[in-house]
Amino acid sequence: MPAKLSVNLNAIAMLRNRRDLPWPDVRHFGRLALQAGAQGLTVHPRPDQRHVRFSDLPLLRALIDDEFPKAEFNIEGYPSEDFLQLCEEAQPEQVTLVPDDPSQATSDHGWDFAAHQVFLTDVVARLKAAGMRVSLFADGDGNAQAVATAKATGADRIELYTGPYGSCYDAPEKAARELALLGATADAAHALGMGVNGGHDLTIANLPALAERIPFLAEVSIGHALTADALEFGMAETVRRFRRACGELA
């Protein structure tokens, strides 16, 4: 089954926040993405609200509930108490936990699962008790022991950090090596019964090879490249192009 496409709206929100104006409207572009066949929406509400604002979350939750009940809402973030309360209020289908420092421009590494196992176990239990699926951001470095530790936290999935693979857009041999490591990490998770998501710097060009190497890839969340392409092709056509890259459309 092809990977589901979840459209990350942070870049849309960042553009909106350049002015004290309500456009571009994050909810409107979320609706366009879902109308074009995206299966979910992803947001990463950072503490300083420089991209998605906390006030966006109930609007996006209502959009999905009222108009696209089969779609999923995925909220990413570092599991601070404030973040966990946001998730408990918004009730996303999935929470993706990332080890970000608040000052980071973007997520750029996975969890050190050995160092944070106890902390993550408690957080995962809390979120799952509230009815949410939990995914943990993981380095795609082929470390099977790290994946086993992630499994031990009780998490349902890992999200492969695909940034190193995405950065090899002009270096095919290096891209092949990174893809092999991602595949090994995914295989380890799959063997343990975990679901596998992917995200970061995925594009129309590099997504097909990832989907071919990891045929059980459950979901990809894509924002930067998708938003950039939408400037040229429009949101609806861009979503269709990414769905084709996932193998969903012929």
Swiss-Prot record:
Quaternary structure and partners: Homooctamer; tetramer of dimers.
EC top class, as a word: transferase
Family, similarity comment: Belongs to the PNP synthase family.
Name used for this protein in its record: Pyridoxine 5'-phosphate synthase
Catalytic machinery residues: 44 (proton acceptor), 76 (proton acceptor), 200 (proton donor)
Assigned keywords, A-Z: Cytoplasm, Pyridoxine biosynthesis, Transferase
Entry function: Catalyzes the complicated ring closure reaction between the two acyclic compounds 1-deoxy-D-xylulose-5-phosphate (DXP) and 3-amino-2-oxopropyl phosphate (1-amino-acetone-3-phosphate or AAP) to form pyridoxine 5'-phosphate (PNP) and inorganic phosphate.
Organism: Allorhizobium ampelinum (strain ATCC BAA-846 / DSM 112012 / S4) (Agrobacterium vitis (strain S4))
GO molecular function annotation: pyridoxine 5'-phosphate synthase activity
Gene3D superfamilies named among the record's database cross-references: Aldolase class I
Localisation per UniProt entry: Cytoplasm
